[in-house]
């Protein structure tokens, strides 16, 4: 799958209507759904959340959750829809998401993450990927990030969408977490250098695809977020 240009998952933004519009503007873009919790898929009519029938672009379904069995079940449901990839959210820092023990807080529990992903991969008909931050709170973005990525790579995860900031889980709301923690693009570039066999797609603060494509030519793709609708 071509991930050179991706539109990030954004709550209350990347619904199927917005994705349809993005598809009109660019046939090359890889699109993401909003994050959908596994329980929402499992306890309702799946098509209410997963219908993607009018989207021609490659589309990634992003799922949230921390229960391996629930994530496995949601992945099974997703197989009947035309998604190119299933992505586990490991980067959302909101307090509501934290209280449900999913999103960025899971970066503190690599063993649980591995269990979740292993169950998803057992049933997924397409690739399973992750979206991460450089770390959370006082996470060591050199040693701990490398260890985290290495652990997931060892179980078969090959694609990492990396928001080039840490997530601060206390004291900042999601909007502040998109702007206050400093960007560290060099750390993402180093991650690719150290794990050259993995697909590394960079996200965070990117508002010009052409300049980013040049700056990050050694990476496997560019992901834009707010720049997709703030113009």
Positions of PLM-derived features:
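Flavin-dependent oxidoreductase catalytic cores
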Residues: 1-231
């Amino acid at each position: 799958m071509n991930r050179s240009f991706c539109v990030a998952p954004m709550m209350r933004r990347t619904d199927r209507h917005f994705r349809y519009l993005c598809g009109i503007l660019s046939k090359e873009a890889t699109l993401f759904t909003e994050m959908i919790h596994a329980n929402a898929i499992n306890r309702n009519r799946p098509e209410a959340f997963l219908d993607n029938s009018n989207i021609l672009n490659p589309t990634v379904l992003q799922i949230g959750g921390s229960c391996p069995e629930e994530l496995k079940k949601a992945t099974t449901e997703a197989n009947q829809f035309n998604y190119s990839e299933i992505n586990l959210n490991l980067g959302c820092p909101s307090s509501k998401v934290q209280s449900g023990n999913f999103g960025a807080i899971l970066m503190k529990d690599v063993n649980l993450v591995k269990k979740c992903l292993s169950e998803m991969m057992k049933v997924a008909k397409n690739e399973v990927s992750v979206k991460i931050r450089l770390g959370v709170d006082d996470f060591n973005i050199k040693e701990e990030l490398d260890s985290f990525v290495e652990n997931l790579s060892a179980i078969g995860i090959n694609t990492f969408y990396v928001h080039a900031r840490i997530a601060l889980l206390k004291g900042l709301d999601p909007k502040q977490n998109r702007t206050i923690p400093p960007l560290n693009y060099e750390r993402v570039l180093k991650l690719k250098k150290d794990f050259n066999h993995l697909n590394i797609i960079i996200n965070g603060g990117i508002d010009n695809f052409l300049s980013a494509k040049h700056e990050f030519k050694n990476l496997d793709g560019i992901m834009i977020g707010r720049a997709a609708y703030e113009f």
